[in-house]
């Protein structure tokens, strides 16, 4: 029997999301206008809480949908205006260009990145050294490329290798269902479980590596670009400004990587089974023998484009998004990708998040119009200049560990800039606060997948169920990194940031604008 019109509408609304989630969103949409009539300030904070809730529930429904509905209603009832949203989007055009073009550009360099990580995995036998290599490689790549892309590449390598061994273990050459272990005998299952543990630890090291590298440069994370633009910093300025905090954090993060592997804490320490290594090595040898001259030229071209990318970013030859567009043009032209649909695939990863970011800016417009963060900022600014740095770092860290970094970073840098323009803080203090905001937004956010987009991407990928990587297990495995990165970052903001920045100024390496 066919379902009723009402039931059909209910099923279509937010698709496969749970009924309680759909009901919660409908309640939000009904309650918000009523509370706005009574107290716009309370309604504004309620909207922010609801939006953070949609981000935290990203596994139930992509936040663009519920967040977008809340943002549309906010504009309709007068919490902000469509004109103000347009101004926020225009002010952050560089970030949108970064997401649209840079992420798509790196898509056409995936073959090179796959080659790099495959070589690392098979050529380094020591698990401690391999983990460190994955962490360092992910950190270095994330300093120049998009973290999501780096994680996507590592996921591709892991899924590929898992599939190769799964087919051998199940004794079926055409093994398409990688989640079906029913055809695998007991001995192979033990080895497969060990292999899963090995891949889990590598993925977590790589994920944390993207956070360690991503915080260091203005292109490492989208919010970095927003903060750099607000402070008027270019690539080199940003790197030097952050280094009093980010360099010690990087060193301690890498030491943590070695420590958890050595002591086999928090689910780390599993080695690559020798049987699996033999199978993977055999497959890699076969692939190398089949590689044509055309394939080799593609890898060489992608490496040259990588050099161009790093050089163009370091010398600030153009806006970041435009450099990404140049990568798309060069990579497609010189590797023979000419089909419109093949080029279009590169944009599928970034455009949903670009749309979500536009919704962020709508909520930011509400925050500005309703002056929601004014009491918090006033509280922080009443403290001494030295204490302000730690307070900004802590408030950013708490919010960014459960919400999206771009959202949090944008809110706080806007408030700090407004305080500077009103004369509440000096330009010099504002620049130090920008560092505290950036590091506070990036470092503690490794605590949960909600905070790090790369972690969320890993959790929702096809790989996660294969290697038994759940939300809880990810939080547990991230815990040692969360503690070390957060505490070392806080200590550096407290004790090294101001004196080292002052020394850089005396040396003439940086200057207050």
From Swiss-Prot:
Annotated keywords: Antiport, Cell inner membrane, Cell membrane, Ion transport, Membrane, Sodium, Sodium transport, Transmembrane, Transmembrane helix, Transport
Name of protein: Na(+)/H(+) antiporter NhaB
UniProt topology in membrane: Multi-pass membrane protein
Summary of the function given for this chain in its UniProt record: Na(+)/H(+) antiporter that extrudes sodium in exchange for external protons.
GO cellular component, one term: plasma membrane
One function term, GO molecular function aspect: sodium:proton antiporter activity
Entry-linked InterPro entries: Na+/H+_antiporter_NhaB
Catalytic reaction(s) noted: 2 Na(+)(in) + 3 H(+)(out) = 2 Na(+)(out) + 3 H(+)(in)
Subcellular location per the Swiss-Prot or TrEMBL entry: Cell inner membrane
Organism this protein belongs to: Escherichia coli O6:K15:H31 (strain 536 / UPEC)
HAMAP family: NhaB (MF_01599)
Coiled-coil positions: none
Family, similarity comment: Belongs to the NhaB Na(+)/H(+) (TC 2.A.34) antiporter family.
Pfam families documented for this protein: NhaB
TM stretches of this protein: 23-43, 52-72, 97-117, 120-140, 144-164, 202-222, 238-258, 303-323, 348-368, 391-411, 447-467, 475-495
């Amino acid at each position: 029997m066919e379902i009723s019109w009402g039931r059909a509408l209910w099923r279509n609304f937010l698709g496969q999301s749970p009924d309680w989630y759909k009901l919660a969103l409908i309640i939000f949409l009904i309650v918000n206008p009523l509370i706005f009539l009574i107290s716009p300030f309370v309604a504004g904070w309620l909207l922010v809480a609801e939006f953070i809730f949609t981000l935290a529930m990203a596994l139930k429904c992509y936040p663009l949908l519920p967040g977008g509905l809340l943002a549309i209603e906010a504009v309709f009832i007068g919490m902000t205006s469509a004109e103000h949203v347009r101004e926020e989007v225009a002010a952050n055009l560089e970030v949108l260009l970064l997401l649209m073009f840079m992420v798509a550009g790196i898509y056409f360099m995936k073959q090179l990145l796959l080659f790099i990580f495959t070589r690392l995995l098979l050529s380094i036998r020591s698990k401690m050294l391999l983990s460190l290599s994955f962490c360092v490689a992910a950190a270095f790549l994330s300093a120049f490329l998009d973290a999501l892309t780096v994680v996507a590449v590592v996921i591709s390598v892991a899924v590929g290798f898992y599939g190769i061994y799964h087919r051998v273990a199940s004794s079926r050459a055409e093994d398409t269902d990688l989640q079906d272990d029913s055809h695998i005998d007991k001995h192979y299952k033990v080895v497969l479980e060990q292999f899963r543990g090995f891949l889990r630890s590598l993925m977590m090291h790589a994920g944390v590596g993207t956070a360690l590298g991503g915080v260091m440069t203005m292109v490492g994370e989208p919010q970095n670009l927003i903060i750099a633009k607000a402070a008027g910093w270019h690539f080199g300025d940003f790197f030097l400004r952050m280094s009093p905090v980010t360099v010690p954090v990087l060193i301690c993060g890498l030491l943590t990587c070695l420590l958890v592997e050595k002591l086999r804490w928090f689910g780390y320490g599993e080695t690559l089974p020798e049987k699996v290594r033999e199978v993977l090595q055999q497959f890699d040898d076969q692939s190398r023998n089949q590689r044509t001259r055309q394939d080799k030229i593609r890898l060489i071209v992608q490496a040259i484009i990588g050099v161009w990318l790093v050089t163009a970013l370091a010398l600030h030859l153009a806006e970041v998004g435009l450099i990404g567009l140049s990568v798309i043009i060069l990579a497609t032209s010189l590797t023979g990708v000419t089909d419109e649909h093949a080029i279009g695939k590169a944009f599928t990863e970034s455009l949903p998040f670009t749309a979500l970011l536009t919704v962020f800016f709508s909520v930011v417009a509400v925050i500005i119009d309703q002056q929601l963060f004014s009491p918090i900022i006033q509280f922080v600014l009443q403290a001494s200049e030295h204490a302000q740095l730690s307070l900004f770092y802590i408030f950013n860290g708490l919010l960014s560990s459960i919400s999206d970094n771009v959202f949090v970073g944008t809110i706080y840098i806007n408030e700090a800039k407004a305080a500077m323009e009103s004369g509440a803080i000096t330009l010099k203090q504002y620049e130090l606060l920008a560092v505290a905001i950036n590091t506070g937004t990036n470092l503690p956010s490794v605590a949960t997948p909600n905070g790090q987009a790369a972690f969320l991407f890993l959790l929702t990928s096809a790989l996660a169920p294969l290697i038994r990587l759940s939300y809880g297990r990810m939080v547990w495995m991230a815990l040692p990194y969360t503690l070390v990165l957060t505490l070392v970052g806080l200590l550096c903001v407290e004790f090294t940031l101001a004196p080292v920045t002052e020394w850089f100024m005396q040396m003439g390496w940086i200057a207050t604008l």
